[in-house]
Amino acid sequence: MNLFSLKAEKFLNLKTLSDLKLIKIFRWDSSEKKDPWYSTYVVSLKNCGPIVLDALIKIKNECDSTVSFRRSCREGICGSCAININGTNSLACLQKLNIKNNIIYVYPLPHIFVLKDLVVDLTNFYAQYRLIQPWLQSSLNIKSKKEIYQSKQDRLYLDGLYECILCACCSASCPSYWWNHDKYLGPAVLLQAYRWIVDSRDDNTLSRLLSLKDSYKLYRCHTIMNCTKTCPKHLNPGKVIASIKKRLLNLEVLGEKRDLNS
């Protein structure tokens, strides 16, 4: 039997079965009046794909169809399968199964309301993203068929920003966001905000900056840097937030006429 459910690890000697992984999944349903619990499953590496998402799909298809989780691209592009694996926020489609630990603990993203099992409610997260107006705002005629020119140098300013997939791994790892998620925008949304602030094609740089000048929206960041450590795309939200603060400081000290894109 290569895939089965266990009630306790004591029924399996994992030290003698190195090709097996014990998967412990957090379970809870917000629609039911039950306390959270853990379901434990065993997956054989011999007939399962190499990543955690493969194991979750195998468990759902062959053992327990009630296990709920999000997934889509399987390539680290969409960010749908963001969960907490062994205490670290990551994408299930990027985290390998063949790690040193025989037991793999799988939780939903921390400090976000759980809908069911590994599925969290991202309503507030997306509402905050909408708040920064994440689209190009230009005074040029939008009906024109001619593209808005951007130099190669200006394009380079977007590197390390546009790659963000809004998986929420960074925001869910930030203690400041845990305590102030209703006011603090969090590292993911602030990184996205900076992506539009530095875009040379956008004409609303000043208003975008001023909209972040708030003791909670921006300044709850205390450079703990969990966001940078956990980002599956290897981005640096902490550095980006510091850059936003610096630009606002320059604006206050040197005045609005300063080149905000420098």
Swiss-Prot record:
PROSITE patterns documented for this protein: 2FE2S_FER_1, 2FE2S_FER_2, 4FE4S_FER_1, 4FE4S_FER_2
GO molecular-function term, one example from the UniProt record: 3 iron, 4 sulfur cluster binding
GO aspect biological process, one term: tricarboxylic acid cycle
Functional pathway: Carbohydrate metabolism; tricarboxylic acid cycle; fumarate from succinate (eukaryal route): step 1/1
Localization per record: Mitochondrion inner membrane
Membrane topology reported for the UniProt record: Peripheral membrane protein
Binding, [2Fe-2S] cluster: C73, C78, C81, C93
Binding site for a ubiquinone: W179
Cofactors demanded by this protein: [2Fe-2S] cluster; [3Fe-4S] cluster; [4Fe-4S] cluster
Positions bound to [4Fe-4S] cluster: C164, C167, C170, C231
Recorded catalytic activity of this chain's protein: a quinone + succinate = fumarate + a quinol
Record's cofactor remark: Binds 1 [2Fe-2S] cluster. Binds 1 [3Fe-4S] cluster.
Subunit structure, interactors included: Component of complex II composed of four subunits: a flavoprotein (FP), an iron-sulfur protein (IP), and a cytochrome b composed of a large and a small subunit.
Stated family: Belongs to the succinate dehydrogenase/fumarate reductase iron-sulfur protein family.
Protein name listed in UniProt: Succinate dehydrogenase [ubiquinone] iron-sulfur subunit
Protein source organism: Cyanidium caldarium
Classification of source organism: Eukaryota, Rhodophyta, Bangiophyceae, Cyanidiales, Cyanidiaceae
